[in-house]
Amino acid sequence: MSDNNEKQTLRTVEGRVVSNKMDKTVTVLVERQVKHPLYGKYIKRSSKLHAHDADNACNEGDVVRVTEIAPMSKTKNWRVVEIVTRAAV
């Protein structure tokens, strides 16, 4: 469509691994704070993402950085880029 060869910036987020029970897949909990439109109080909001972990390297409690990819399955369209911090065992 476009003649530009510009690369789109991929969305990357950080979150905590809450489940690694699936093969090559982890569940990542991403928390953010949003401001209430009327009262101005900051509220915690969270979402769970399924991310591809090819090496099965992540454990529960690890903080990871994930990036958006083309869908790999019905629910999995994120990939683990790096493990920021390991969980204390």
Curated annotation (Swiss-Prot):
Pfam families: Ribosomal_S17. One of the primary rRNA binding proteins, it binds specifically to the 5'-end of 16S ribosomal RNA. Belongs to the universal ribosomal protein uS17 family. Keywords: Ribonucleoprotein, Ribosomal protein, RNA-binding, rRNA-binding. The lineage of its organism: Bacteria, Pseudomonadati, Pseudomonadota, Gammaproteobacteria, Lysobacterales. Coiled coil: none annotated. GO terms for molecular function: rRNA binding; structural constituent of ribosome. This is Small ribosomal subunit protein uS17. Part of the 30S ribosomal subunit. One of its GO terms (cellular component) is cytosolic small ribosomal subunit. HAMAP family: Ribosomal_uS17_B. GO terms for biological process: translation.
